[in-house]
Regions:
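Gram-negative (and chloroplast) outer-membrane scaffold detector with strong preference
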Residues: 19, 23-25, 34-36, 66-152, ...
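Surface-exposed strand-loop-strand hairpins of Gram-negative outer-membrane beta-barrel proteins
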Residues: 36-63, 159-167
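Cleavable N-terminal export/targeting peptides
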Residues: 1-24
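Short sequence motifs at beta-strands and strand-loop junctions characteristic
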Residues: 55-61, 111-118, 163-170, 220-225
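Predominantly the C-terminal beta-signal and adjacent terminal strand-loop region
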Residues: 86-90, 100-102, 182-236
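Transmembrane beta-barrel strand/turn architecture of Gram-negative outer membrane proteins
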Residues: 168-179
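Extracellular loop and loop/strand-boundary signature of outer-membrane beta-barrel proteins
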Residues: 49-53, 104-112, 156-163, 214-220
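Outer-membrane beta-barrel translocator domains and adjoining extracellular loop/strand segments
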Residues: 40-47, 89-96, 147-158, 200-207
Length: 236
């Protein structure tokens, strides 16, 4: 008898649980978001001449936030936000050019640090499912702004200064899924590609007085990251 009552109670709890989103539902999500830049290294030029140097940004993980508004059970609008991502940028000098010019080995050295915010607005399409598992596809637009760009101590001593990265405007595509825990709470996982391209500019001065390179440097960086999120959501 006790087992039967328990089964009935469980069935009753499931019967009152809607497995679909409705028009007007608003979901706030929070959790971990990782930005993983493209592994390709960006070339560097000085006054228009290519140098035997490349650079690459590192991954970073921050607190991610999502705000999702549903127009019906299939269509929703999502805004992606996060605390500022903090990327270390590494210099690659396989030929030893910096060592021969400045007597400083900068190969695979931490060149700089930069912060960025990549707010993204996406249209989401949720597939019809009769279960608590809700897969979706998303297409959106992204605007990434870079700030607090700075060289580390060693490159600064070699004359690198005035680092600046242009803001970027591009598209985003994503694949994700919600797992509904009850009427309010859900788990969310997503993977998205964001088209982020920026131009980094900087100055190079002969601060060590060794007859080193002097001029204006430039690098076109195709960051184009994959962005992975694991979040807990609450529906209002």
């Amino acid at each position: 008898m006790k087992k039967s009552l328990l089964c009935l109670a469980l069935l009753a709890s499931f019967s009152t649980f809607s497995a679909n989103y409705q028009a007007g539902d608003f979901v706030i999500r929070g959790g971990l978001t990782q930005v993983k830049p493209d592994s390709n290294q960006a070339g560097i030029s000085l006054d228009g001449s290519a140098l035997p140097l490349t650079l690459s940004p590192e991954d970073n993980t921050q607190l991610g936030l999502n705000f999702v508004y549903f127009y019906d059970q299939n269509w929703a609008l999502e805004v992606l936000a996060a605390t500022p991502f903090d990327h270390d940028i590494y210099l690659h000098d396989p030929t030893g050019a910096t060592n021969s010019i400045y007597n400083i080995d900068l190969n695979d050295a931490k060149l700089a640090n930069v912060k960025q915010l990549p707010p993204t607005i996406s249209a989401l399409y949720y597939f019809d499912t009769a279960s608590v598992f809700k897969p979706y596809l998303g297409l959106g637009i992204n605007y990434t702004v870079f700030f607090e760009e700075k060289f580390t101590a060693t490159p600064k001593a070699a004359g690198f200064s005035d680092l600046s990265l242009d803001s970027s405007f591009g598209y985003s595509v994503q694949l994700g899924a919600d797992y509904l825990l009850d009427d309010q709470w859900s788990l969310n996982v997503s993977a998205r590609y964001i088209d982020i391209n920026t131009q980094a500019t900087f100055n190079v001065e002969d601060s060590l007085n060794v007859g080193g390179l002097v001029g204006k440097g430039k690098s076109n960086v195709d960051i184009d990251p994959m962005v992975y999120s694991l979040m807990l959501g609450y529906k209002f």
